[in-house]
Amino acid sequence: IPHEGMYTKQELKELVAYCAARGIEVIPEIDVPGHNQALAAAYPEFFCFPNPDTKVKTDEGVTLHLICPHKPEVWKFYAAVFKELKDIFPSGIVHLGGDEAPLEKTWAKCPLSIQYREQKGMKDVHEELKEFIKKMSSMLAVHGKRIQLWYEKPWARANIYNKGDTVFTWRMGLTPSTIT
């Protein structure tokens, strides 16, 4: 899908009102830690391996651009985004994506992530991801929001989902494993 700009806050508010008048709840999705190529193009310094030549992705698929959870500016950015969401979307839910994040190719090799895991005694990137999702959830809870996530089987086996998370399957055949 070609990149064709963005919605203004006012346009989003009008869309939410239009949908609400028809009984439809609009739930925003802010993808983390991956699927954020536009963010990588705008703020390459937020990522484990910054590349100032990153372009906005115009097709589907997975990239190696994962935000680095150990850069303070990343958390300031998301705090501001979550505050703005509260003013635009009355829904009590924010979907965080959370799928198709190649942790073994990014966080596993990120110097800041490696240092953090060593300091905290974490055995792998899945423990780091669980903590990351929990922190994102806490930040949204301040604004009265709860999270939803896409289901990833390896992450479920690693027990990254926290109590109260709503998880959706999107890959064929995975639904039975989400309810076990």
Question: What residues fall within each predicted segment?
Answer:
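Substrate-binding cleft of carbohydrate-active enzyme catalytic domains
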Residues: 1-143
